[in-house]
UniProtKB/Swiss-Prot annotation:
GO terms for biological process: translation. This is Small ribosomal subunit protein uS8. The gene is rpsH. InterPro entries: Ribosomal_uS8 (IPR000630), Ribosomal_uS8_CS (IPR047863), Ribosomal_uS8_sf (IPR035987). One of its GO terms (molecular function) is structural constituent of ribosome. GO terms for cellular component: ribonucleoprotein complex; ribosome. Belongs to the universal ribosomal protein uS8 family.
Length: 132
């Protein structure tokens, strides 16, 4: 079966693992999923990111991050720009998630960047998702 929205698949798998308080989640790898997972790692939403080859399909293993008493670090994940309705922003319209407490993931001409980096470089792009 062909996956129509791999970013939504990544977010859904991470959201479900987070709700069920799983230690880790495995997803089929792609360059865009790797870039989004790297941003999650840089921003402190996940503990570890590992890529391995499981036969014909390369996989990503994302180790989830929890607080002291298994409190969730990721409160929410939301897909913004969808295949049926793309959402773009100009350099002066880069969104802030929860007044800067969350992260917007933006696909720019310089690659996939968090909102803070896009603001610093003064570039806009396609708003892929929000993480908070």
């Amino acid at each position: 079966m062909v996956m129509t929205d791999p970013i939504a698949d990544l977010l859904t798998r991470v959201r479900n693992a987070n709700i069920a308080r799983h230690e880790a989640v495995e997803i089929p790898a792609s360059n865009i999923k790797k870039a989004i997972a790297n941003i999650m790692l840089q921003e402190g939403y996940i503990t570890d990111l590992e890529e391995y080859n499981d036969g014909a399909v390369p996989m990503l293993k994302i180790t989830m991050k929890y607080g002291q008493n298994k409190e969730r670090v990721i409160t929410g994940l939301k897909r913004i720009s969808k295949p049926g309705l793309r959402v773009y922003c100009r350099k002066d319209e880069v969104p802030k998630v929860l007044n800067g407490l969350g992260t917007a993931v933006i696909s720019t001409s310089k690659g996939i960047l968090p909102d803070k980096e896009a603001r610093k470089l003064s570039i806009g792009g396609e708003v892929l998702c929000y993480i908070w």
